[in-house]
Structure formats: structure tokens, C-alpha cells
Amino acid sequence: MEINREIKNITSAFVLEDNLTECVPYGSGHINDTYRLTYGTGKHYILQKMNRSIFTKPVELMENVSGVTAWLKKKIQENGGDVERETLNLVMTKDGLPYYVDEDGEYWRVYLFIENATCYDMVKDEEDFYQSAVAFGHFQRLLADYPAETLHETIVNFHNTVDRLDKFKTAVEKDICHR
């Protein structure tokens, strides 16, 4: 993506360096618009425009993200881990918020880019699947004593495991793809 005035205005709202040299689409996600920012020092960040069709409560979403990532940082530090690699790190705006709202009402957020990290869209083998489960279990363990009552429900029933499992079973029974 060309570093146009819009991108410069958006990035200038965050506590970032001044010498943005590149802004390119990043990843294969299909919900948010995601870009990798490169600065003159070689440092990278992730810039995301949140999809308001999916995330209709972006302020509440970002309160959740801020709370959970702060909690994870504390737990990771207590365990002697690397907080810049083991959890997302939000970059705040100059106003101290974890998001910026542009003149069109679009919500943007910035994270530190985790160098040399790997993200899989699909598992290649059983080991990948196993390691994903290990990572998810570790994530759950770190959040075991998180005050869940502080979280906002930003997508109805999204984290309701019972509801999701019921919907999955119904989809399997219907087998509309004839698998």
C-alpha cells in the first residue's frame, strides 16, 4: 500500500517512530485489513483496520484485548518469559487509547510485530495440530484466574463452547457438503 496521507494520519496518531518507509498488506486473514509497517530503523509493526461489520462494539473489543494482554504480560513476566514474543503488545495512541478512530469512523489498532514468528492457516500434520493444542492449553492456563466478569460480550455466543459444539454437531448431521 502506498504511504498516502491517510496512512500517515493514522500512524501519526500512535506512539510510533516518524520515519515510516513501507506499508504493505500482511497475512491471509479475511476479517480485518492488516498491514505490516516498516520504519527507517528497520522496526516493524502490525496496523489493522477493524471490520465493523463483524466487530460492532470496537471500543469494548479493545477493552477486552487491553485487559487480556496486560494480564498475559504480567503472567509471562512472572514466569520469566519474553513478553514481546509470547503475547500481543498493543501500541497506544498519543491520547493513551489502544485504538484510533479516523475521520470516516473506522477503528484502527497497532501491535508490535513479532519477528520470525510463524502462523499457520492450516495444519500440515498431526504434530502441528498437537503443538497448536499445547499452545492453546498454555494460553488457557495463563488466563485461568483472569476476572472473566470484566470481559464484554462483543459477538453473541462466540465464546460459548456449548453453543458452538451444538452448532458443529448440527452441521455435521446436515452434511451439506456430503463429506
Outline where the language-model segments fall.
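Juxta-kinase regulatory segment immediately upstream of eukaryotic protein kinase catalytic domains
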Residues: 1-24, 68, 72
